[in-house]
C-alpha cells in the first residue's frame, strides 16, 4: 500500500511557520509572499546545513534521500526542489523581488488562492493535450530518413542477374544487317540559322552629319523675268518723278546747281551759268561727295524783291554731277 505524503504547498507553509530553516520567512503573510534562501554552492561561506537545509528536508520528505544510505548531493536536492516549485499551479515566482546573484541571493514566491474543481479539470485537460502533442512529435521524429535508409538496405537483391542482361547477337546476323543497311554518308553539320548579331546604332559625332547638304534650286525663267520687269518699272517711275518735279539748272558765279523751288526763274534771269566739276573731298564718315565753293561774296539782295513769297531758308542747292 503506497505511503501518502503531504503536498508541497501545505508542507512549505508548515516549514515557514516552524522558523527552523534559516532564511525561509514570510515577507507579507497577508498576500502569502515568502522568500527562500538561494545561495549558490560555489560562493564563499556556503554551508550545507544552513544553505541547503530546505532542499535536504524536501529530499527526505519525498524519499529520495536517506541519511547514512546515500552520499549527500546538494546540487541534485536543489534541482529537484526547483522543478517541484515550478510544477505547482498555485505558486508563482515574484521575479522583480528575487535576487539570483551574490551571497544574499533569495527567491521570492507568492501562494495563489487554491484552484477550484473546474480550474483543476481545465488544467488536467490542457496537460493531457500537451502530452498528446509531445507524443505525436516524438512519433514523427522516429520516422526519420535513417529509417528509410535502413529499409532500403534491408531489401535483398537476387543473386542471379542473368535475366537483366540482353542476349548476345550471332555474328552472321550482324553481317546480314550490315548488308541490308545502306551506306550512310558522313553527316555534314551545316547551320541554317542566321548569324546572331547585336544591333548597333552608329551615332555621328556632330549634329551636322545628321542633315545632308542641299543646293537651292535655280529660279525659273518666269520668276527671273518677273524680277527684271519689276526693276524696269521702278526705274521708269523714278524717271517720271524726276521729270514732274521740275528740276531746273541754274548757274551762280560760274557754279552750276539744280533748283526745284516753286517760283524759280529761268536761267535768263540769273545769266549764263555753267556746270563745273568740284574736287572730291573725303567726308568725316568716310564717303566721297561734291561740295560747292564759297558763296559768301555773292550779292543776292536783289533776289528779295523777286522771290518774296519764297522762303529762302528752305532753298536747297544741289551741285551738278560731272
From Swiss-Prot:
Glycyl lysine isopeptide (Lys-Gly) (interchain with G-Cter in SUMO) crosslink residues: 276, 296
Gene Ontology molecular function: DNA-binding transcription activator activity, RNA polymerase II-specific; DNA-binding transcription factor activity, RNA polymerase II-specific; RNA polymerase II cis-regulatory region sequence-specific DNA binding; transcription cis-regulatory region binding
Modification note: Phosphorylated by CK2 and this positively regulates its activity.
CDD domains: IRF
Keywords tagged on the record: Acetylation, Activator, Antiviral defense, Cytoplasm, DNA-binding, Immunity, Innate immunity, Isopeptide bond, Nucleus, Phosphoprotein, Repressor, Transcription, Transcription regulation, Tumor suppressor, Ubl conjugation
GO biological process, one term: defense response to virus
PROSITE patterns for the chain: IRF_1 (PS00601), IRF_2 (PS51507)
Record PTM N6-acetyllysine, positions in chain: 78
Compartment(s) where it occurs, according to its Swiss-Prot or TrEMBL record: Nucleus; Cytoplasm
InterPro entries according to UniProt: Interferon_reg_fac_CS, Interferon_reg_fact_DNA-bd_dom, IRF1/IRF2, WH-like_DNA-bd_sf, WH_DNA-bd_sf
Domain of life: Eukaryota
DNA-binding region listed in the record: 5-113
Regulation: Activated by MYD88.
SMART domains recorded: IRF
Function: Transcriptional regulator which displays a remarkable functional diversity in the regulation of cellular responses. Regulates transcription of IFN and IFN-inducible genes, host response to viral and bacterial infections, regulation of many genes expressed during hematopoiesis, inflammation, immune responses and cell proliferation and differentiation, regulation of the cell cycle and induction of growth arrest and programmed cell death following DNA damage.
Matches recorded under PANTHER family: INTERFERON REGULATORY FACTOR (PTHR11949), INTERFERON REGULATORY FACTOR 1 (PTHR11949:SF3)
Assigned protein family: Belongs to the IRF family.
Listed name of the protein: Interferon regulatory factor 1
Native species: Sus scrofa (Pig)
Lineage: Eukaryota, Metazoa, Chordata, Craniata, Vertebrata
Amino acid at each position: 500500500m503506497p505511503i501518502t505524503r503531504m503536498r508541497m504547498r501545505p508542507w512549505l507553509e508548515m516549514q515557514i511557520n516552524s522558523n527552523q530553516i534559516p532564511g525561509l520567512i514570510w515577507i507579507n503573510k497577508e498576500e502569502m509572499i515568502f522568500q527562500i534562501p538561494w545561495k549558490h554552492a560555489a560562493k564563499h561561506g556556503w554551508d550545507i546545513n544552513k544553505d541547503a537545509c530546505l532542499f535536504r528536508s524536501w529530499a527526505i520528505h519525498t524519499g529520495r534521500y536517506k541519511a547514512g544510505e546515500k552520499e549527500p548531493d546538494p546540487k541534485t536536492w536543489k534541482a529537484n526542489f526547483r522543478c517541484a516549485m515550478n510544477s505547482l499551479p498555485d505558486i508563482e515566482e515574484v521575479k522583480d523581488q528575487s535576487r539570483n546573484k551574490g551571497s544574499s541571493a533569495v527567491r521570492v514566491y507568492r501562494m495563489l488562492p487554491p484552484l477550484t474543481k473546474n480550474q483543476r479539470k481545465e488544467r488536467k485537460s490542457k496537460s493531457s493535450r500537451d502530452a498528446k502533442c509531445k507524443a505525436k512529435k516524438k512519433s514523427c521524429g522516429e520516422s526519420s530518413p535513417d529509417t528509410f535508409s535502413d529499409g532500403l538496405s534491408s531489401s535483398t537483391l537476387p543473386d542471379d542477374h542473368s535475366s537483366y542482361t540482353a542476349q548476345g547477337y550471332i555474328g552472321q546476323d550482324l553481317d546480314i544487317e550490315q548488308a541490308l543497311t545502306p551506306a550512310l554518308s558522313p553527316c555534314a553539320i551545316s547551320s541554317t540559322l542566321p548569324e546572331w548579331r547585336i544591333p548597333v546604332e552608329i551615332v555621328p559625332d556632330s549634329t551636322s552629319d545628321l542633315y545632308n547638304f542641299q543646293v537651292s534650286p535655280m529660279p525659273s525663267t518666269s520668276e527671273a523675268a518677273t524680277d527684271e520687269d519689276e526693276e524696269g518699272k521702278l526705274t521708269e517711275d523714278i524717271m517720271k518723278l524726276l521729270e514732274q518735279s521740275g528740276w531746273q539748272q541754274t548757274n551762280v558765279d560760274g557754279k552750276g546747281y539744280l533748283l526745284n523751288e516753286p517760283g524759280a526763274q529761268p536761267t535768263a534771269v540769273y545769266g549764263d551759268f555753267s556746270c563745273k566739276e568740284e574736287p572730291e573731298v573725303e567726308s568725316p564718315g568716310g564717303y566721297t561727295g561734291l561740295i560747292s565753293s564759297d558763296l559768301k561774296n555773292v550779292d543776292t539782295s536783289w533776289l528779295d524783291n523777286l522771290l518774296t513769297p519764297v522762303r529762302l531758308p528752305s532753298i536747297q542747292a544741289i551741285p551738278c554731277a560731272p
